[in-house]
């Protein structure tokens, strides 16, 4: 597990109140981790803060799983 993956999973755990051990890359924020629409907005904001990036609304709507969040962060974080 790389640094970005660890950071994303830590944020997901903190924002959604789930154990990091229960978070799998294929986990859906809504279906598997119990997030509602407000949770997903707060999750996106936390990811933006953590990685110093801005996620446009149309992109944020496409991020529905842990893996999609990891992939987005990897593609958009400045090294």
Swiss-Prot record:
Q: Does the record's keyword annotation contain Phosphoprotein?
A: yes
A matching Pfam family: PP-binding
Key words of the record: Cytoplasm, Fatty acid biosynthesis, Fatty acid metabolism, Lipid biosynthesis, Lipid metabolism, Phosphopantetheine, Phosphoprotein
Q: Which GO terms describe its molecular function?
A: acyl binding; acyl carrier activity
Q: Name one GO biological process term.
A: lipid A biosynthetic process
Q: Where is the Carrier domain?
A: 2-77
Localization recorded for this chain is: Cytoplasm
Quote the cellular component terms of the Gene Ontology held in the record: cytosol; membrane
Task: Give disulfide pairs as residue numbers.
Answer: none
The pathway this protein participates in, as annotated, is: Lipid metabolism; fatty acid biosynthesis
How does it get modified after it is made?
Answer: 4'-phosphopantetheine is transferred from CoA to a specific serine of apo-ACP by AcpS. This modification is essential for activity because fatty acids are bound in thioester linkage to the sulfhydryl of the prosthetic group.
Q: What does this protein do?
A: Carrier of the growing fatty acid chain in fatty acid biosynthesis.
**Which family does the UniProt entry place this protein in?**
Belongs to the acyl carrier protein (ACP) family.
What name goes with this protein?
Answer: Acyl carrier protein 1
């Amino acid at each position: 597990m790389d640094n970005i993956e660890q950071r994303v999973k830590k944020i997901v755990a903190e924002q959604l109140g789930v154990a990091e051990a229960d978070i799998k890359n294929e986990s859906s924020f809504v279906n598997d981790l119990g997030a509602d629409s407000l949770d997903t907005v707060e999750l996106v904001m936390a990811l933006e803060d953590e990685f110093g990036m801005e996620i446009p609304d149309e992109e944020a709507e496409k991020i529905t799983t842990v893996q999609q969040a990891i992939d987005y962060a990897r593609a958009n974080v400045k090294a």
